[in-house]
């Protein structure tokens, strides 16, 4: 029986976020609407979710002692990891001591590292995946590339948003892909996964929410990546009934194994009726930003309900919808966005500007959203809206 108290009072229901990016920001807003007291934690000040939380803390989240100190100080009812780069061993300890980690500390620990989740999916759950090897040294990596053949893909086992990821097409790429992977890992140099390339027709994110009443799937989200980073997404992605049924089977198997309650972003490769498991995030997914315009309950609202043990009787999808990111390149701590009237001039469009405090290189600073009569029209409209935004550094 869910009971929510009064924020900033002894009856408050407290939720603490480990990571305070744009996805967390939307979940915080949903929790604020339900009268939840929210604490946002990240490694830098004024992170997006901090701007809408009751209070915030800045710590190195890979420092287990610092993470424990904040959690023991705040005594949250729910701990919500929003990113992978967290001292997950500390979350496991805290969960054993009685804290609730969303969805589970094991899910956070397994998905922080591509090896944990790949071995779970392929070796324990026997789900279809690309052929793969792991390697710690250049020698082992070279042998894996030789074994899998070209083309193949290399990624650091610990990285996100495409960092350190390369597609190898010939022997000329072997050294530079290794060097790039060593630069791109979250915890510095280290282990990589080498995957055989799947010649897929398209890739999807199946947003899968585990809640008090069971497991519910959102309509499949199609997306386009560049260098492993999402550029645009759309919903619903057209699929054969067989491919959709197999996608739901795979997503249910992996999310059931990870357990707990919350939103999961299950990434899958599709070719005809065939489905391969790629990755899973035990939290809302960047490609799922499209649900801010495509569904009555966005992935963020669904995550909030699942966390609090509230029912999800139905998810209503509004038809062809798309998102296009607003990518900013350069250096600034005072970025401004202009020409917004033009960006929002067409019907059924929306913008989210994330409020990130700085840009240093390339950074996703917002997203344009659109609905239309077809996926093609929705994608074109979202791209027009995104392109219309003028960025001032």
Swiss-Prot record:
It catalyses: N(1)-(5-phospho-beta-D-ribosyl)glycinamide + formate + ATP = N(2)-formyl-N(1)-(5-phospho-beta-D-ribosyl)glycinamide + ADP + phosphate + H(+). It comes from the Bacteria. Its EC number is 6.3.1.21. The keyword Ribonucleoprotein does not apply. Pathway: Purine metabolism; IMP biosynthesis via de novo pathway; N(2)-formyl-N(1)-(5-phospho-D-ribosyl)glycinamide from N(1)-(5-phospho-D-ribosyl)glycinamide (formate route): step 1/1. GO terms for biological process: 'de novo' IMP biosynthetic process. Residues 119-308 form the ATP-grasp domain. N(1)-(5-phospho-beta-D-ribosyl)glycinamide binds at residues 22-23, 82, 286, 356, 363-364. InterPro entries: ATP-grasp (IPR011761), ATP-grasp_carboxylate-amine (IPR003135), ATP_grasp_subdomain_1 (IPR013815), PreATP-grasp_dom_sf (IPR016185), PurT (IPR005862), PurT/PurK_preATP-grasp (IPR054350), PurT_C (IPR048740). GO terms for cellular component: cytosol. One of its GO terms (molecular function) is ATP binding. Involved in the de novo purine biosynthesis. Catalyzes the transfer of formate to 5-phospho-ribosyl-glycinamide (GAR), producing 5-phospho-ribosyl-N-formylglycinamide (FGAR). Formate is provided by PurU via hydrolysis of 10-formyl-tetrahydrofolate. Belongs to the PurK/PurT family. NCBIfam families: PRK09288.1, purT. Homodimer. This is Formate-dependent phosphoribosylglycinamide formyltransferase. It comes from Pseudomonas syringae pv. tomato (strain ATCC BAA-871 / DC3000).
């Amino acid at each position: 029986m869910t009971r929510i108290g009064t924020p900033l009072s002894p009856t408050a229901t407290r939720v603490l976020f480990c990571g305070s990016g744009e996805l967390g920001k939307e979940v915080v807003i949903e929790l604020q609407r339900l009268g939840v007291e929210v604490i946002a934690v990240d490694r830098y000040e004024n992170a997006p979710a901090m701007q809408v939380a009751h209070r915030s803390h800045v710590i190195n989240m890979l420092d287990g002692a610092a993470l424990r100190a904040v959690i023991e100080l705040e005594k949250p009812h729910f701990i919500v990891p929003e990113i992978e780069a967290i001292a997950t061993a500390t979350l496991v300890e805290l969960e054993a001591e009685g804290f609730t980690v969303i969805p589970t500390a094991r899910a956070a620990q397994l998905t922080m590292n591509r090896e944990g989740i790949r071995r779970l999916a392929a070796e324990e759950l026997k789900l279809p995946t690309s052929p793969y090897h792991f390697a710690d040294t250049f020698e082992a990596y070279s042998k894996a590339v030789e074994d899998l053949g070209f083309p193949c893909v290399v990624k650091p086992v610990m990285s996100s948003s495409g960092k350190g990821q390369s597609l190898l097409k010939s022997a000329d790429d072997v050294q530079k892909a290794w060097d790039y992977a060593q630069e791109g890992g979250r915890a510095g140099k280290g282990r990589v996964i080498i995957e055989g390339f799947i010649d897929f027709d398209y890739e999807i994110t199946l947003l899968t929410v585990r809640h008090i009443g069971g497991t519910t799937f959102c309509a499949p989200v199609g997306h386009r990546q560049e260098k492993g980073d999402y550029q645009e997404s759309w919903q619903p992605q057209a699929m054969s009934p067989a491919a959709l049924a197999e996608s739901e089977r795979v997503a249910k198997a992996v999310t059931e194994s990870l357990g707990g309650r919350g939103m999961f972003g299950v990434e899958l490769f599709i070719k005809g009726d065939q489905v391969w498991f790629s990755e899973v995030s035990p939290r809302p997914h960047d490609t799922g930003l499209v649900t801010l315009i495509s569904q009555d309950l966005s992935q963020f609202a669904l995550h909030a309900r699942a966390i609090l043990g509230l029912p999800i009787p139905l998810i209503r999808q509004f038809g062809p919808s798309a998102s296009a990111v607003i990518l900013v390149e350069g250096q600034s701590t005072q970025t401004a966005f202009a020409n917004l009237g033009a960006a929002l001039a067409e019907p059924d469009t929306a913008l989210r500007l994330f409020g990130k405090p700085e840009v240093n290189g390339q950074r996703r600073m917002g997203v344009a959203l659109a609905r239309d009569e077809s996926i093609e029209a929705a994608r074109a409209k979202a791209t027009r809206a995104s392109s219309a935004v003028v960025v001032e550094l």
